[in-house]
UniProtKB/Swiss-Prot annotation:
Native organism: Homo sapiens (Human)
Residue ranges constituting the STI1 domain according to the UniProt record: 178-206, 208-247, 379-426, 430-462
Residue ranges with Polar residues bias: 106-115
Domain topic, free-text comment: The ubiquitin-like domain is essential for its inhibitory effect on GPCR endocytosis. Mediates its association with the subunits of the proteasome.
Disease: Amyotrophic lateral sclerosis 15, with or without frontotemporal dementia: A neurodegenerative disorder affecting upper motor neurons in the brain and lower motor neurons in the brain stem and spinal cord, resulting in fatal paralysis. Sensory abnormalities are absent. The pathologic hallmarks of the disease include pallor of the corticospinal tract due to loss of motor neurons, presence of ubiquitin-positive inclusions within surviving motor neurons, and deposition of pathologic aggregates.
Region (12 X 3 AA tandem repeats of P-X-X): 491-526
Impact noted for substituting A282V: Found in a patient with frontotemporal dementia; likely pathogenic
Described function: Plays an important role in the regulation of different protein degradation mechanisms and pathways including ubiquitin-proteasome system (UPS), autophagy and the endoplasmic reticulum-associated protein degradation (ERAD) pathway. Mediates the proteasomal targeting of misfolded or accumulated proteins for degradation by binding (via UBA domain) to their polyubiquitin chains and by interacting (via ubiquitin-like domain) with the subunits of the proteasome.
GO molecular function, one term: molecular condensate scaffold activity
Name of this protein: Ubiquilin-2
Length: 624
């Protein structure tokens, strides 16, 4: 028995090492877990070992999303996962969701270091620089704004494409650069009615994919949204822009003084790392980069790394102060000084016109605007989807029926805010433009890439003529009419098919700067659209002398203005009489004590029906 015991003893120790080997082999073949990786637009499921590192997890994700590992940012439970950590350390188990943000590579240094990766990623690195050359990545729509904040039923607008994302980003940047426009939007009755409905706002917020991710990472936010008192207080603050601005200033001041408190600097760093940095990284492709990136790079380079030990008593600058118009004023002064030899009044008018032309030309000659026009030309499906949607038609119809709203939108645009001269010349053309936008021929021409290309060629040709042959375009004077267009270019007949494209001209750098802009509404009733000199000669008898000085400085603007007036003559019978159109405003002005009906009508025509601007105009014209 002893021998048997001894003989049976050795197998037991032999099983011990086998068991030890089995236990040692268990970590080598760990449990496979399924983790869902969710981006703002899609989600994928990955099967990875439980003890995988974040770097290994990123390598698996990069193959599926065709991106480099250094572009991937993984967020779980409100924290950014570091490459050296493992999934177990962060508590990532089977069935959980990890959020992914794909960063864009804007710096060429990052692209030059990509070929040093593995051979499996070299193929993607060869293809990613081409796609990353665009400002907006096709995988990026972090806030779900392609579908208008997650609103259902608006996908037919075609707003999820890359080109519209770039257009949307530019509009958002202009909106953020114009706080007055943001305030007026918040004070809009429609927006106020939306903010007064907590249930509707809660539904809109919960429908936003970005807010859904934020709620998943921070469940306490859902409790705030479900609290009616907090929602009511928040919406009351949102309805009061002045209160919101004051709260923002107080918060900025409190954060600036937080550094002087012991431990405050670390709290600021932790808040930035855990909250602000993930949100900014998620939004950087939409808004053009992290606005604090330069601050971080400068602080890491040497200066400003030590926290402040004293209280900051310097007043904060006013972030809502309008930017100084030094460049525009300098341009105006130089242009007026160059034309001072021909008289004071004519030189001022010439200087203002040239300054307005330079202002608009500088905007439309920017690479971003040229790229946008090129993308619109190359992507007719986007324009067709937008213009054929019933929402766009109803919006254009409502704007044409409410010229006050259209004029207010134009005045609030950053393009016109800093240039009153451009505002005065665009107001008379606005009703004709809105009605032309409802013309089916105009909509079909805008969705036709060849028609858009022809329009761009016309614009480029006019600019070339104005530069190379300035003596040719002065022949198109206001008194001659558009009949010269037929003799100089060809028969009058081929001019009429271009009529639907006429409203696009105000978007060109030289379109809105016609010197006879205020007479636009008076010209269409006399013109028949046939190209004869009948229409323009009615309103050009007197202005022919006053606009002669500007014909030398901007003859191409006169030519474009004549085209716009002639092409708008086709829809002239649809325009109501100004007295009928502004009947309500005239009655209000009469009740206020402005008894001169003719002066009131002229003020309303000049201001596009804006009664507040008309009152200011009437008060300014009265002798003091």
């Amino acid at each position: 028995m002893a021998e048997n015991g001894e003989s049976s003893g050795p197998p037991r120790p032999s099983r011990g090492p086998a068991a030890a080997q089995g236990s040692a082999a268990a970590p080598a073949e760990p449990k496979i877990i399924k983790v869902t990786v969710k981006t703002p637009k899609e989600k994928e499921e990955f099967a990875v070992p439980e003890n995988s590192s974040v770097q290994q997890f990123k390598e698996a994700i990069s193959k599926r999303f065709k991106s480099q590992t250094d572009q991937l940012v993984l967020i779980f439970a409100g924290k950014i996962l570091k490459d050296q950590d493992t999934l177990i350390q962060h508590g990532i188990h089977d069935g959980l969701t990890v959020h992914l943000v794909i960063k864009s590579q804007n710096r060429p240094q990052g692209q030059s270091t990509q070929p040093s990766n593995a051979a499996g990623t070299n193929t993607t690195s060869a293809s990613t620089p081409r796609s990353n050359s665009t400002p907006i990545s096709t995988n990026s729509n972090p806030f779900g704004l392609g579908s208008l904040g997650g609103l259902a039923g608006l996908s037919s607008l075609g707003l999820s494409s890359t080109n519209f994302s770039e257009l949307q980003s530019q509009m958002q940047q202009q909106l953020m650069a114009s706080p007055e426009m943001m305030i007026q939007i918040m004070e809009n009755p429609f927006v106020q009615s939306m903010l007064s409905n907590p249930d509707l706002m809660r539904q809109l917020i919960m429908a936003n994919p970005q807010m859904q991710q934020l709620i998943q990472r921070n469940p306490e936010i859902s409790h705030l949204l479900n609290n009616p008192d907090i929602m009511r207080q928040t919406l009351e603050i949102a309805r009061n822009p002045a209160m919101m601005q004051e709260m923002m200033r107080n918060q900025d001041l409190a954060l600036s003084n937080l550094e002087s408190i012991p431990g405050g600097y670390n709290a600021l760093r932790r808040m930035y790392t855990d909250i602000q940095e993930p949100m900014l990284n998620a939004a950087q492709e939409q808004f053009g980069g992290n606005p604090f990136a330069s601050v971080g790079s400068s602080s890491s380079s040497g200066e400003g790394t030590q926290p402040s030990r004293t209280e900051n008593r310097d007043p904060l600058p006013n972030p809502w102060a309008p930017p100084p118009a030094t460049q525009s004023s300098a341009t105006t002064s130089t242009t007026t000084s160059t034309g001072s030899g021909s008289g004071n009044s004519s030189s001022n008018a010439t200087g203002n016109t040239v300054a307005a032309a330079n202002y608009v030309a500088s905007i439309f000659s920017t690479p971003g605007m040229q790229s946008l026009l090129q993308q619109i030309t190359e992507n007719p499906q986007l324009i067709q989807n937008m213009l054929s949607a019933p929402y766009m038609r109803s919006m254009m119809q409502s704007l044409s029926q409410n010229p006050d709203l259209a004029a207010q939108m134009m005045l609030n645009s950053p393009l016109f805010t800093a240039n009153p001269q451009l505002q005065e010349q665009m107001r008379p053309q606005l009703p004709a433009f809105l009605q032309q936008m409802q013309n089916p021929d105009t909509l079909s021409a805008m969705s036709n890439p060849r028609a858009m290309q022809a329009l761009m060629q016309i614009q480029q040709g006019l600019q070339t003529l104005a530069t190379e042959a300035p003596g040719l375009i002065p022949s198109f004077t206001p008194g001659v009419g558009v009949g010269v267009l037929g003799t100089a270019i060809g028969p009058v007949g081929p001019v009429t098919p271009i009529g639907p494209i006429g409203p696009i001209v105000p978007f060109t750098p030289i379109g809105p700067i016609g010197p006879i802009g205020p007479t636009g509404p008076a010209a269409p009733p006399g013109s028949t659209g046939s190209g004869g000199p009948t229409g323009p000669t009615v309103s050009s008898a007197a202005p022919s002398e006053t606009t002669s000085p500007t014909s030398e400085s901007g003859p191409n603007q006169q030519f474009i203005q004549q085209m716009v007036q002639a092409l708008a003559g086709a829809n002239a019978p649809q325009l109501p009489n100004p007295e009928v159109r502004f009947q309500q405003q005239l009655e209000q002005l009469n009740a206020m004590g402005f008894l001169n009906r003719e002066a009131n009508l002229q003020a309303l025509i000049a201001t596009g029906g804006d009664i507040n601007a008309a009152i200011e105009r009437l008060l300014g014209s009265q002798p003091s």
